[in-house]
Amino acid sequence: MIKITVPATSANLGIGYDTLAMAVSLYSHFTFERADKLTITGCPEEFQNENNLVYVSFVDALAAWGEPAFPVAIDIQTDVPVARGLGSSSTCVVAGIMAAAALTGHTVDRAELVRIATEVEGHPDNVAPAILGGAVCSFTPTDSLPQCLRYEVSDRLRFITVIPPYEVHTSEARKVVPQEIPLSTAVWQMGRIAGMTRGLETGDLDLIAAANDDRIQEPYRRRLIPDYNAVRDTCLNGGAKTIWISGSGSTLMAVTDDTIVAKFLQVKLREQFPKCDTHILTCDTEGAQIEYL
């Protein structure tokens, strides 16, 4: 039996639409073992079948290596909610691929994991930091493999994470984003992406806040999150330096380097928004891990 632990991820980091993402200290845990028939536990019954994304990713990885599919027993225990902008699908994809490698004896480095996960998921945004840990800037050159640039994130930073009780599906969130932008907007974004990566590395809150001024997606996606304005005001008035939408939402993530401020905000947010889950997270630096039981 093997156990695979995969971190949640926060994509975009405000300014880096479809480019930047970060692994965070919220996790999904998966166990796998060979079995006589496919069984999946720990998730709603509607997902306990061969269409489960974990098993689909498992089978796709086997096919990529020329291996036949075989039945397994999978148990899923997760703290990463679905359709909240925390990379829940990426945790499933990464776990399935890693399990396929482990149960067939394939030695696969992390670059290969990213490549296969990108093929399954369709883009490297979330799977790359889920595998590599840290913050990642990713892009896929024409007719080439995905390029993933990993950055360290200062361990001083705390991310106050507010998870509303409602979903925002990526497909819906993409519909509200303009398909074309002016050149001036592209220039605005590019400099700030560089500023964000540097600010995260150094823990420079002023730089992070200055860089976090997106003009591509947040002005439109915030309308899909009823609690956006109220949560934002509470966080900024309570001492957080800045706040962004995690992925396509509905999760919101505020940033500070002061643990007292983080704890104060967690209490205040839980009081004001009792239906939301509120966590104080850090950047996960290790990425997905496997344990042989």
What are these regions (language model features)?
Residues 1-84, 98, 106-108, 284-286, ...:
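ATP-binding N-lobe of GHMP and related small-molecule kinases
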Residues 12-13, 21-24, 66-67, 120-121, ...:
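Solvent-exposed alpha-helices and their adjacent loops that cap or buttress functional pockets
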Residues 26, 86-110, 131-136:
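DPxDG-like acidic metal-binding loop motif
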Residues 33, 130-132, 136-141, 253-257, ...:
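Short beta-strand-to-turn element immediately C-terminal to the catalytic PLP-Schiff-base lysine
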Residues 35, 63-73, 100-116, 143-147, ...:
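Phosphate-handling active-site elements
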Residues 108-157, 243-245, 249:
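Alpha/beta catalytic cores of group-transfer enzymes, especially the acyltransferase/condensing modules
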Residues 136, 140-149, 167-199, 208:
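Anionic-ligand binding region
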Residues 200-293:
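Glycine-rich, charge-dense phosphate/pyrophosphate-binding loop(s)
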